[in-house]
């Protein structure tokens, strides 16, 4: 019976404690002139994530989105959203925890951030903006691969010296 209780304590657990908007900004630096032009924007999306340990097994993950729309060479709008969440995560190995904080949690936060961006763009009276889904698992795998390559690069340079 003690073995069963011990195994239950070790079982991975993931709980969302809170999802909230940490920071938001919307700018239309060239209004009202931007509304007089034909609407043919170039939209750029920048993503960033970061995490911090708040307490034992409790983490804050912040997903930052910056959406910039250029129209005819002028900035039509700049929208920045930091969507955050507090997560309780237990029973994971270090690689599993890193994946949870770097991919799984941002996957949870993205729909909230996307909705906030869409709402702000609409309030700015611009045409509807629907951000495409993001594959955070692929982005995290790319990040891990880049870190591994950066870690092996100095060792290779020393061997060649």
UniProtKB/Swiss-Prot annotation:
Keywords: Chaperone, Cytoplasm, Protein transport, Translocation, Transport. It is found in: Cytoplasm. The keyword Chaperone applies. Pfam families: SecB. One of its GO terms (biological process) is protein transport. One of the proteins required for the normal export of preproteins out of the cell cytoplasm. It is a molecular chaperone that binds to a subset of precursor proteins, maintaining them in a translocation-competent state. It also specifically binds to its receptor SecA. This is Protein-export protein SecB. It comes from Shewanella baltica (strain OS185). The lineage of its organism: Bacteria, Pseudomonadati, Pseudomonadota, Gammaproteobacteria, Alteromonadales. The gene is secB.
